[in-house]
From Swiss-Prot:
Name of the featured protein: Glycine--tRNA ligase alpha subunit
A single Gene Ontology CC term: cytosol
Assembly behavior: Tetramer of two alpha and two beta subunits.
GO molecular function: ATP binding; glycine-tRNA ligase activity
Compartments (UniProt record): Cytoplasm
Biological process (GO), any one: glycyl-tRNA aminoacylation
Enzymatic reactions: tRNA(Gly) + glycine + ATP = glycyl-tRNA(Gly) + AMP + diphosphate
Originating species: Rhizobium meliloti (strain 1021)
EC number from the UniProt entry: 6.1.1.14
UniProt cross-references to InterPro entries, sorted A to Z: aa-tRNA-synth_II/BPL/LPL (IPR045864), Gly-tRNA-synth_heterodimer (IPR006194), Gly-tRNA_ligase_asu (IPR002310)
Enzyme class: ligase
Keywords attached to this entry: Aminoacyl-tRNA synthetase, ATP-binding, Cytoplasm, Ligase, Nucleotide-binding, Protein biosynthesis
PROSITE patterns (alphabetical): AA_TRNA_LIGASE_II_GLYAB
Pfam families per record: tRNA-synt_2e
Amino acid sequence: MNPKRSFQALILTLHNYWADKGCAVLQPYDMEVGAGTFHPATTLRALGPKPWRAAYVQPSRRPTDGRYGENPNRLQHYYQYQVILKPNPSNLQELYLGSLEAIGLDPLLHDIRFVEDDWESPTLGAWGLGWECWCDGMEVSQFTYFQQVCGIECSPVSGELTYGLERLAMYVQGVDNVYDLNFNGREGAEKISYGDVFLQAEQEYSRHNFEYANTAMLHQHFIDAEKECLALLAAGAPGDSSNNRLHKCVFPAYDQCIKASHVFNLLDARGVISVTERQSYILRVRTLAKACGEAFLLTEAGGANWNREAA
């Protein structure tokens, strides 16, 4: 399949490229998240000493970015392609440029520039040294060296690559409106466009996010998710015995942290959170994320009982 002809071929090409580089090609996380970074394959797996390589597509929701389907390149629901490489390889930039070449962007024929742009996620308590990648004057992706996630220092440092799939597809297909993207690579009566798949949903979710979402219910959902996250962390906490030193409920707890984050974003879109309240909500979600990160380090996947020399 030609990645220049369809949205789905672009994704499949990236899957094949990163699979060949040793990544586990994972599925999207089945929850509402604001970015691919929220997937536990990145947020949690970036912590601890164990090596990790994964790639996946993640549907991402940013309610405040909705424009009722009237903006040609701004969406409240879009797709990111995420790659996490731990420890960070010395040739990360070379690998990234290779991925661009795989999808038809030859670095020798295009003006590829890296613009310094350090990344931060306040709700995840995460930040890293990063660069935007611009191709012929348009940002197409970003790569970051994680320094901290969940308020915890990353050791070793992970390399993260994030591709904005719609923007990248618009560039390689040469279209100016995201809804005109060829989705399935066919023409004529068999052609399915991005708009055929997503335009109605974009219009309806914009109404939901800005006009219809029940704010009283959302406030309660946030409180419930916060309480459940903390309760699950307490329930799964290690005991004093030698047979009970690992945490037993990190992923369910982290799901509740994700829920709280999305509910906060919906409340923000509805315009019912003041400036001071906004900072309070961010701090509350970050507190949950930090607690989940600390608990993850007490699991096998997080490196507890891991022998670096034996690995």
